């Protein structure tokens, strides 16, 4: 990693004699879990191996341009069948669950299934398999991350995984996943949810937010058992499912990722997870529902569709989770979310727990989100700015016409790991992918215009190392956890600084280190001020050209920012009920601290939010490509 940063620090974007496009021989990155397997060709980027190059389109098959190297493989979606409560499942007399790897609920007790060595290997891998990334060399630094929690009677944080408050079976699964201790967001979210409180959690990317809601929800589910099906359920010719936990995510990829994590932590339990999203066969999803669903991961559009078809009832929902909640609301999913929360048979806000997680919560989004919460705790983990010091951020001044050549120089300096490149448009993603393939790189693309099958195959190829470069639009920017991404490149800098935060957070996750490189020119001056602030807060180098352009923009435009709705960056990780005040409330200098520190002497909450802000007038139109 240090080699990458060092090579980049010596990079001159004006130097066209770097040899980036020469026929150099470079070693192809092979993930640890596929090393030693038979490979065809030399594995040389420039050597046109594995059908990359030569006949550049030979590996596209019937896919459209931008397909790159995307053969199917491990990582394909399982719709809840097989060993996770599908066709092998059965309901025995007096019990709930069954099957080869499903536990049962019998006479008020949870009876876990027997261990399954093959399934454990598939779910959790082995300790040396870095494709199952858990924590890195800087994981212990999380103990020093500042934490602020505001609200009435905030519960004390935990310092380690133990029972109570966590269920013993869940602890076994956490150990199988090689999670040795909770991250700061998990230290606080577990007792907060266990206490029956609603939660709005803002934590930097790669900090364990998925475990932050899965652990407490599953722990309670394992202990309390399934809810009884309403008597009226048998009066319909359509067999409905009655999940007790619903997790909403903005994209298909994030929903699938959450589902994959849920499969790990529901191993041997009675809880049957399932995922539904648009772009895949709704008939197949309906068929899988016949085998039961207790924890449902869904995108808003597909869940709305299934509700209208009356295949799902939300009457038994105890937990509603909105992951990347700010993004869902900002993307225009508010009508679907309101239809799900307020227009269905879901219990009212007073009769369920609602949890919202994201890396950023601008105050305007907090106002809107408070409609769905009651007496909630606002949790802010990490410094305002929400980027990790595990990520080395590099800003290069690159004019648009120089971007391709500069990109080749960067890729030549990156000797190992996976590279994720972000562009702004779908057309740019396809064009850049084709360019990289022509240059001999193993690249593929993911964006909203590709079919779901193409997107899944592209992600599979990238995760397994068959494609070492993934070119993506914002569809992959939020929440995705792809192991071994060592370099993120913002080929196009987004207009919103929060999107920048989420993009670079695809590397440097769970205490691992990473590099994020951004191409900047005067066309991006509207975000210069906040970019300087972000770099300074994360102890990163601020190039002189960026400071100069920031001053130019401030003098000419009064320092106003572009992007969505003109949000104030300073409030994106602070409870809006506090009026943006930096003092007061509860705070901790680190996630492991058992006390709340001296937060200004306040012992109470910050008042009750009225929550009735109505519909957002500035939400963007919903794009069906997201759901």
UniProtKB/Swiss-Prot annotation:
Keywords: ATP-binding, Cytoplasm, Helicase, Hydrolase, Initiation factor, Nucleotide-binding, Protein biosynthesis, RNA-binding
Any GO molecular function: RNA helicase activity
PROSITE patterns: DEAD_ATP_HELICASE (PS00039), HELICASE_ATP_BIND_1 (PS51192), HELICASE_CTER (PS51194), Q_MOTIF (PS51195)
Gene3D superfamilies in the cross-refs: P-loop containing nucleotide triphosphate hydrolases
Compartment(s): Cytoplasm
Chief place where the protein resides: cytoplasm
Amino-acid positions noted as binding ATP in the UniProt annotation, renumbered to this chain: 203-210
A single cellular component GO annotation: cytoplasm
Motif DEAD box boundaries: 323-326
Sequence ranges of Polar residues compositional bias: 7-23
Entry keyword annotation includes RNA-binding: yes
Residue stretches making up the Helicase C-terminal domain: 406-550
Bias kind Low complexity: ranges: 76-87, 609-627
Bias (Gly residues) ranges: 556-568, 581-608
Region named Disordered: 1-96, 553-627
Domain statement: The Q motif is unique to and characteristic of the DEAD box family of RNA helicases and controls ATP binding and hydrolysis.
Protein name as catalogued: ATP-dependent RNA helicase DED1
Species lineage: Eukaryota, Fungi, Dikarya, Ascomycota, Saccharomycotina
């Amino acid at each position: 990693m240090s080699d990458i940063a060092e090579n980049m620090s010596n990079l001159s974007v004006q130097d066209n004699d770097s040899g980036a496009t020469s026929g150099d021989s470079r070693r192809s990155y092979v993930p640890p879990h596929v090393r030693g397997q038979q490979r065809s060709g030399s594995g040389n980027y420039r050597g046109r191996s594995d059908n990359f190059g030569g006949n550049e389109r030979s590996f596209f098959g019937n896919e459209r341009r931008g397909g790159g190297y995307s053969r199917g493989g491990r990582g394909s979606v399982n719709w809840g069948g097989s060993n996770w409560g599908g066709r092998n499942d059965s309901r025995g007399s007096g019990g709930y669950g069954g099957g080869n790897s499903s536990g049962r609920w019998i006479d008020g007790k949870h009876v876990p299934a027997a261990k399954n060595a093959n399934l454990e290997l598939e779910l959790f891998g082995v300790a040396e398999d870095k494709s199952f990334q858990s924590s890195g060399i800087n994981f212990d630094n999380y103990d020093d991350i500042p934490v602020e929690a505001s609200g009435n009677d905030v519960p004390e944080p935990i310092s380690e995984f133990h029972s109570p408050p966590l269920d013993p079976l869940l602890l076994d699964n956490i150990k199988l996943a090689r999670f040795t201790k909770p991250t700061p967001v998990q230290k606080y979210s577990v007792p907060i949810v266990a206490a029956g409180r609603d939660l709005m959690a803002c934590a930097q990317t790669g900090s364990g937010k998925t475990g932050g809601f899965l652990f407490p929800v599953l722990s309670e589910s394992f202990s309390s058992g399934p809810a009884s099906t309403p008597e009226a359920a048998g009066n319909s010719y359509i067999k409905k499912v009655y999940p007790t936990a619903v997790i909403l995510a903005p994209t298909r990829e994030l929903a699938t990722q959450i589902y994959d994590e849920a499969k790990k932590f529901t191993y041997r339990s009675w809880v049957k997870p399932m995922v539904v999203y648009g772009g895949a066969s709704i008939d197949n999803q309906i068929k899988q529902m016949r085998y039961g669903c207790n924890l449902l991961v869904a995108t808003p559009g597909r869940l709305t569709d299934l509700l209208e078809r009356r295949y799902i009832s939300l009457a038994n929902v105890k937990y509603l989770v909105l992951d990347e909640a700010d993004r869902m609301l900002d993307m225009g999913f508010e009508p679907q979310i309101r239809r799900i929360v307020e227009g269905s048979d879901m219990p009212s806000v007073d009769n369920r727990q609602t949890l919202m997680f994201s890396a950023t919560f601008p105050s305007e989004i907090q106002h809107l989100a408070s409609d769905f919460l009651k007496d909630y705790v606002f949790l802010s983990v990490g410094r305002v700015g929400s980027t990790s010091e595990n990520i080395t951020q590099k800003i290069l001044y690159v004019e648009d016409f120089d971007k391709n050549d500069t990109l080749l120089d960067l890729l030549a300096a990156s000797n190992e790991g996976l590279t994720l490149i972000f562009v702004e448009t779908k057309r740019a993603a396809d064009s850049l992918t084709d360019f990289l393939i022509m240059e001999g790189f193993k690249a593929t693309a993911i964006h909203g215009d590709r079919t779901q099958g193409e997107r899944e195959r592209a992600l599979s190829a990238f995760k397994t190392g068959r494609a070492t470069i993934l070119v993506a639009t914002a569809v992959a920017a939020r929440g995705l956890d792809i192991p071994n991404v060592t370099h993120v490149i913002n080929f196009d800098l987004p207009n919103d600084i929060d999107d920048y935060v989420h993009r670079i957070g695809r590397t440097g996750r769970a205490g691992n280190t990473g590099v994020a490189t951004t191409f900047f020119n005067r066309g991006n001056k509207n975000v210069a001020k906040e970019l300087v602030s972000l770099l300074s807060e994360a102890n990163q180098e601020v190039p002189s050209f960026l400071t100069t352009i920031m001053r130019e923009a401030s003098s000419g435009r009064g320092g106003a920012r572009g992007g969505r709705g003109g949000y104030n960056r300073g409030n994106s990780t602070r409870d809006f009920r506090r009026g943006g005040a930096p003092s007061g409330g509860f705070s901790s200098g680190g996630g492991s601290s058992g006390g709340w520190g001296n937060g200004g002497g306040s012992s109470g909450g910050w008042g009750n939010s009225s929550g009735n802000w109505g519909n957002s007038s500035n939400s963007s139109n919903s794009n069906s490509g997201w759901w």
